[in-house]
């Protein structure tokens, strides 16, 4: 028997930036028993992320920026090293990630390859992230990057081996970045 869901109540608690909803629903379990649940769900839209790599130089491009949620949760300076990423904002995932790559890193990359799409925190966040990789070349640098007006993004070109070590040691603590670095390592695209 499949699980059946009956929506009882969907109340918007806040929609100042994204939407926080309180959802009440009945869930029919596999054994037929109906259980009522009440959960808060944060809807921030879907996103995309990309890891830029250079197989000749054996480097990757990451960014460092302030993330308030990490600061609230004990990251002393709130800075996070991560892959370039952004919300889709009604764009197709590849269109979004190309725009974000130029804005954040300055690279106008050629071919991009979609790897997978994942829910990163499905217990309470609706966001589905589309994961990409792309090889970059120095000649594809269209600008210095750094983000748009209200962003302060530092562009980091790192040896791939160093980035992997940073992920292993906990210096890189962003889930999407650790996933993409490990994907690149397992795929042997860096030789």
Curated annotation (Swiss-Prot):
Superkingdom to which the source organism belongs: Bacteria
Keywords assigned by UniProt, alphabetized: Hydrolase, Magnesium, Metal-binding
Annotated Nudix hydrolase domain residues: 43-180
This protein's GO CC annotations: cytosol
Enzymatic class: hydrolase
Residues that coordinate or bind GDP-alpha-D-mannose: 17, 38-40, 67, 85-87, 104, 127, 150-151, 176
Cofactor: Mg(2+)
Family the entry assigns: Belongs to the Nudix hydrolase family. NudK subfamily.
Subunit structure: Homodimer.
Function: Nucleoside diphosphate sugar hydrolase that hydrolyzes GDP-mannose as its preferred substrate, yielding GMP and mannose-1-phosphate.
Name this protein carries in UniProt: GDP-mannose pyrophosphatase
Organism: Salmonella arizonae (strain ATCC BAA-731 / CDC346-86 / RSK2980)
Source organism phylogeny: Bacteria, Pseudomonadati, Pseudomonadota, Gammaproteobacteria, Enterobacterales
